[in-house]
C-alpha cells in the first residue's frame, strides 16, 4: 500500500520530478519571458547642471567618488549618471584633440617635403660640382710635375710590356731614357744640356733605348721608340743602308746590342753579343718631356 502511494509523484505531469534535467527545463522556460535587458532612459541635462559639471571637468577630468557624489547632490542626479557624463566628456575631448591634430598633420607633412626637396637640390648641386674636380686636376702644371716624376733619373721609363720581354740582360734598361710623345705636343719642352739635369749620375754607359720583340726578324718597333731611333740614326745613313734598316723594323737578333762610341764622326753600329750602349757625349743631348 505504501509503495503504491509513493509512485504517483512520478506521474503528475513531471512537475514533482526531481533532477538536473527538470531544473534545466524550468530555467529554459523562464528565459523567453525576459529575452533582453530594458533600455535605460536618456538623461537630459539642464543648462545649470551642465555648467556645474563643466566647472568640475575644468578642474579635473577624473573626479573621485566624493566629488561625483557632491555634484550629484547639487544637480539632483544619481552618482552613476555623473560618472557616465564624465566618461563621455573625456571621450569627446579626445575626439576633438584627434581632429585638431589630424588637421595640423598636413602642415608638418609639407614642411617635411620641403627639406626633402632641399636635399634633392643639394644632391643635384653636388652632382653638378662633382665633375669639375677631376677636370681641374688635369692642369699643365700637374702634368708637368707628373712628367718630371716620370722622367726623373731614379724612375723607370714607361715602356710597354711587349717591349720588356728581353732575354739578353744587356738590353734591359736601368735608368730612365726620355722619348718624344707625339700625342702631347702642348706640354713638350726641350732641355738643352743634360749635365745640369742628370746631376750626380754616371752617364757613361746608357743601355739601349729600345726593347723590340727579338724573337722574329723584322719585328716592328713601338711608335714611341721608332721616331726616337730614327732621329739618332739619321746621322749615319751609310751604316743604316749597310745594315738594311727599314723605317719601322729591325733585323738584328736577340744577342745584338748597339754601341755608340764615336760621338763626333758618323756613328757605327756593331752588333756584338757582349757590347752595350755607351753615351759619352752628354752635352749634345736634347730631352723632351710630356
Swiss-Prot record:
Chain intervals for the UniProt region annotation (Disordered): 93-142
Biased composition (Polar residues): 94-103, 116-129
GO biological process: anterior/posterior pattern specification; eye photoreceptor cell fate commitment; positive regulation of transcription by RNA polymerase II; regulation of transcription by RNA polymerase II
Pfam hit, one: Homeodomain
The entry's DNA-binding region: 38-97
Domain of life assignment: Eukaryota
Protein's cellular compartments: Nucleus
Manganese found in the keyword field: no
Cellular component aspect of the GO annotation: nucleus
Keywords: Developmental protein, Differentiation, DNA-binding, Homeobox, Nucleus, Transcription, Transcription regulation
Disulfide bonds: none
Gene Ontology MF terms: DNA-binding transcription factor activity, RNA polymerase II-specific; RNA polymerase II cis-regulatory region sequence-specific DNA binding
Tissues where this protein is expressed: Initially expressed in the Spemann organizer of early gastrula embryos. Expression in the organizer begins to decrease during late gastrulation and has disappeared by stage 11.5. Expression then persists and intensifies in the anterior neuroectoderm. Exhibits a dynamic expression pattern during neurulation and by neural tube closure (stage 20), expression is restricted to the cement gland anlage and epiphysis (pineal gland) anlagen. During tailbud stages, expression in the cement gland decreases and from stage 24, expression appears in the neural retina.
SMART domains: HOX (SM00389)
PANTHER family: CONE-ROD HOMEOBOX PROTEIN, HOMEOBOX PROTEIN
General function of this protein: Transcription factor involved in anterior and eye development. Promotes the differentiation of both rod and cone photoreceptors cells in the retina. Together with other retinal homeobox proteins, acts as an effector of a cellular clock which, depending on cell cycle progression, establishes the generation of distinct retinal neuronal cell types. Acts synergistically with nrl to activate the rhodopsin promoter. Promotes the formation of anterior regions and represses the formation of posterior structures during development.
Name of the protein described by the UniProt record: Homeobox protein otx5-B
Amino acid at each position: 500500500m505504501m509503495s503504491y502511494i509513493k509512485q504517483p509523484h512520478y506521474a503528475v505531469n513531471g512537475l514533482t520530478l526531481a533532477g538536473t534535467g527538470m531544473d534545466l527545463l524550468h530555467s529554459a522556460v523562464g528565459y523567453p519571458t525576459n529575452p533582453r535587458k530594458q533600455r535605460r532612459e536618456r538623461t537630459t541635462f539642464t543648462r545649470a547642471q551642465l555648467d556645474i559639471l563643466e566647472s568640475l571637468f575644468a578642474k579635473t577630468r577624473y573626479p573621485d567618488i566624493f566629488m561625483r557624489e557632491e555634484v550629484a547632490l547639487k544637480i539632483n542626479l544619481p552618482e552613476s549618471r555623473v560618472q557616465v557624463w564624465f566618461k563621455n566628456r573625456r571621450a569627446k575631448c579626445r575626439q576633438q584633440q584627434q581632429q585638431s591634430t589630424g588637421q595640423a598633420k598636413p602642415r608638418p607633412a609639407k614642411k617635411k617635403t620641403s627639406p626633402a626637396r632641399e636635399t634633392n637640390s643639394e644632391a643635384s648641386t653636388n652632382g653638378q660640382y662633382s665633375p669639375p674636380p677631376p677636370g681641374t686636376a688635369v692642369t699643365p702644371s700637374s702634368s708637368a710635375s707628373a712628367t718630371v716624376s716620370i722622367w726623373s733619373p731614379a724612375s723607370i721609363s714607361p715602356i710597354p710590356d711587349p717591349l720588356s720581354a728581353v732575354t739578353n740582360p744587356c738590353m734591359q734598361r736601368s735608368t730612365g731614357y726620355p722619348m718624344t710623345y707625339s700625342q702631347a705636343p702642348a706640354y713638350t719642352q726641350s732641355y738643352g744640356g743634360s749635365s745640369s739635369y742628370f746631376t750626380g749620375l754616371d752617364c757613361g754607359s746608357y743601355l739601349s733605348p729600345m726593347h723590340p720583340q727579338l724573337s722574329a726578324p723584322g719585328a716592328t718597333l713601338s711608335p714611341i721608340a721608332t721616331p726616337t731611333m730614327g732621329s739618332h740614326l739619321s746621322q749615319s745613313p751609310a751604316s743604316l743602308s749597310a745594315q738594311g734598316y727599314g723605317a719601322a723594323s729591325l733585323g738584328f737578333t736577340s744577342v745584338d746590342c748597339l754601341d755608340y762610341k764615336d760621338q763626333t764622326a758618323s756613328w757605327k753600329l756593331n752588333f756584338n753579343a757582349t757590347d752595350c750602349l755607351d753615351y759619352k757625349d752628354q752635352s749634345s743631348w736634347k730631352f723632351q718631356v710630356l
